Amino acid sequence: MAVSVTPIRDTKWLTLEVCREFQRGTCSRPDTECKFAHPSKSCQVENGRVIACFDSLKGRCSRENCKYLHPPPHLKTQLEINGRNNLIQQKNMAMLAQQMQLANAMMPGAPLQPVPMFSVAPSLATNASAAAFNPYLGPVSPSLVPAEILPTAPMLVTGNPGVPVPAAAAAAAQKLMRTDRLEVCREYQRGNCNRGENDCRFAHPADSTMIDTNDNTVTVCMDYIKGRCSREKCKYFHPPAHLQAKIKAAQYQVNQAAAAQAAATAAAMTQSAVKSLKRPLEATFDLGIPQAVLPPLPKRPALEKTNGATAVFNTGIFQYQQALANMQLQQHTAFLPPVPMVHGATPATVSAATTSATSVPFAATATANQIPIISAEHLTSHKYVTQM
């Protein structure tokens, strides 16, 4: 998507403040030492500021009486730094405009605001944080976003970055979660409610000062619901029995939801702690092979689903199985036959057991109550591969 940004020639980075003492003729510093400009009579000074000659910075100004300032070396260095910062800002603003158009393409209903081109000078004050400017944009320097295009109202960004929620809507949603408020009957306020106080599903407060004019609700006296309000003139609403049951049911639902959320959070924390404490099973332990013989295998990733299935092809499992197969083909390990150990048996039984053990070609004859010792050289000389 091509984005054309027309650069506007900006002379703010070439602007220098004129020395007021020099204008009065009382500056004791020469122009090569004063941090302010000492312009000549041919230079144009507006509002105590003068524009430096761009050609003079390049060393190619050939005008006899130039109306722009030819700065001394120390001011020239400052202007060169300002020029580099201006170029960086122009590139950043071009990227900013491109990202805004991309964001507008993703949200067709949102209007695209024009981005003015402006520069950053050391004398300009930085604006507020630009993080709330657009959720699709990365961290941008606060000076790159002008104050007139920043949102004035505080914004809350939801999980979908393209749908920012105003703070007023979030506050309204928070008020709806409160169980100590009841909506006032509008017909009762007009004097047209045919239902009585004990039949209407809305509140009929006797005192209009209890009503919150922002959302037309009244705050319920929780002490009255618990049967312990002793105020002579309570500023909170004392609801009838059917509205008390409604409030108690809402409180029960909120408490149940909070308990379920706390249980889910605790379970997630416990599961993460168990996963962090689990030690992956070594492949050398699975095969009964010394660790010095085999190279380390890649770790086998655990499946995330509880049913043991995965919906996508996992390259980590494939690498683990391939490394395991290569290990079986390349490393020739010995097959260790089972040697029976019979504790408390008769000599005849032990001799029968050792006879079965000595039937293996490479096993040495074992005496009673002894395990045949096989050297590592003998194991490597016989090519027996373990059966997987």
Curated annotation (Swiss-Prot):
Record carries keyword Zinc: yes
Any one GO biological process: embryonic limb morphogenesis
Residue spans, zinc finger C3H1-type: 13-41, 47-73, 179-207, 215-241
Compartments, as annotated in UniProt: Nucleus; Cytoplasm; Cytoplasmic granule
One Pfam family named in its UniProt record: zf-CCCH_10
GO molecular function annotations of the record: double-stranded RNA binding; RNA binding; zinc ion binding
Record's keyword terms, sorted: Corneal dystrophy, Cytoplasm, Disease variant, Metal-binding, mRNA processing, mRNA splicing, Nucleus, Phosphoprotein, Repeat, RNA-binding, Zinc, Zinc-finger
Family: Belongs to the muscleblind family.
Disease: Dystrophia myotonica 1: A muscular disorder characterized by myotonia, muscle wasting in the distal extremities, cataract, hypogonadism, defective endocrine functions, male baldness and cardiac arrhythmias.
Name of protein: Muscleblind-like protein 1
